[in-house]
């Protein structure tokens, strides 16, 4: 029996919280998660998926360019050019992009994990990263000129991938070149050591997401209590700094 897309009840603005669930609007789970600016890649990377993710990042940036984006990744990789579309969008949008690796982060998925905002690249403790060089499928039926042209394109992508890894990680060039020659798997600890991620664990970040989601809901509620009085705490040196991001484990 297929699992299907789960749906959850969602109350529109102005609806009473104690309304019956039958009167609520049922929407896809991901549509509600998008309200917390959480984006998910849970499939192989191809152009349809890449266009969806890039478009969502751009829309959320237009909606609010000051709030973080949270990009959850669990993918076996996929098309290099489609992955580069997502990577370029991550660098283009104004909000900082958290990348959160869960499960397997192979090939182009590991490249996207590296592409997150520096100090905001996280990974689950039981995840696995796999890196290798870009490749193209050739057969004996391919024309030699076509193979030669494709080889040049693959080499250009390989140089670009190496440049990004060298700029955004602590991988020495010699080590990186050696690892790219084959499928090289890393644990979360190894990925942190090489600078592919900045920290391990996302528990505190999930708590922050819940808090931000609640604050957004209160901003739409005219009966919500006025929290402006809390700004007086800024005059108290012992008051907790609520604007400071939580320390990530």
UniProtKB/Swiss-Prot annotation:
Q: Which compartment or compartments is the protein found in?
A: Plastid, Chloroplast stroma
Q: Does the keyword Plastid apply?
A: yes
- Indicate the residues that form the catalytic site: 107, 132
Keywords noted in UniProt = Chloroplast, Hydrolase, Plastid, Protease, Serine protease
Q: Highest taxon of the source?
A: Eukaryota
Q: Which SUPFAM superfamilies match?
A: ClpP/crotonase (SSF52096)
Which positions make up the signal peptide?
none
Map out region (Disordered) in residue numbers: 212-249
The cellular component terms of Gene Ontology attached to this UniProt record, alphabetical and capped at eight, are: chloroplast stroma; endopeptidase Clp complex
Annotated Gene Ontology MF terms?
A: ATP-dependent peptidase activity; ATPase binding; serine-type endopeptidase activity
What catalytic activity does the UniProt entry give for this protein? Answer: Hydrolysis of proteins to small peptides in the presence of ATP and magnesium. alpha-casein is the usual test substrate. In the absence of ATP, only oligopeptides shorter than five residues are hydrolyzed (such as succinyl-Leu-Tyr-|-NHMec, and Leu-Tyr-Leu-|-Tyr-Trp, in which cleavage of the -Tyr-|-Leu- and -Tyr-|-Trp bonds also occurs)
EC number(s) for this protein? 3.4.21.92
Task: Give the principal location in a single coarse category.
Answer: plastid
Q: Transmembrane: present as a keyword of the record?
A: no
Q: Name one GO biological process term.
A: protein quality control for misfolded or incompletely synthesized proteins
User: Record's family?
Assistant: Belongs to the peptidase S14 family.
* Subunit structure of this chain's protein: Component of the chloroplastic Clp protease core complex.
User: What function does this protein fulfil?
Assistant: Cleaves peptides in various proteins in a process that requires ATP hydrolysis. Has a chymotrypsin-like activity. Plays a major role in the degradation of misfolded proteins.
Name it.
ATP-dependent Clp protease proteolytic subunit
Tell me the organism's taxonomic lineage. Eukaryota, Viridiplantae, Streptophyta, Embryophyta, Tracheophyta
């Amino acid at each position: 029996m297929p699992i299907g897309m789960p749906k959850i009840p969602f109350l529109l603005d102005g609806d009473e919280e104690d309304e019956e669930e039958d009167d609520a609007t049922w929407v896809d789970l991901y549509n509600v998660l998008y309200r917390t600016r959480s984006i998910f890649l849970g499939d192989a990377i191809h152009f349809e998926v890449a266009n969806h993710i890039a478009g969502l990042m751009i829309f959320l940036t237009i909606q609010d360019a000051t709030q973080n984006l949270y990009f959850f990744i669990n993918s076996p990789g996929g098309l290099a050019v489609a992955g580069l579309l997502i990577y370029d969008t991550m660098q283009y949008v104004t909000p900082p992009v958290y990348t959160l690796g869960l499960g397997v982060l192979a090939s182009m998925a590991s490249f996207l994990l590296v592409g997150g905002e520096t100090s905001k690249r996280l990974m689950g403790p039981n995840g696995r990263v796999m890196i290798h060089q870009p490749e193209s499928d050739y057969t004996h039926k391919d024309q030699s000129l076509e193979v030669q042209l494709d080889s040049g394109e693959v080499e250009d992508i390989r140089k670009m991938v190496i440049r990004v890894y060298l700029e955004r990680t602590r991988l020495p060039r010699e080590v990186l070149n050696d690892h790219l020659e084959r499928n090289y798997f890393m644990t979360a600890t190894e990925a942190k050591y090489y600078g592919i991620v900045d920290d391990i664990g996302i528990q505190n970040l999930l708590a922050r997401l819940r808090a931000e989601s609640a604050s957004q809901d209160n901003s739409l509620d005219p009966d919500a209590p006025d929290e402006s009085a809390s700004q007086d705490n800024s005059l108290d040196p012992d008051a907790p700094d609520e604007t400071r991001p939580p320390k990530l484990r």
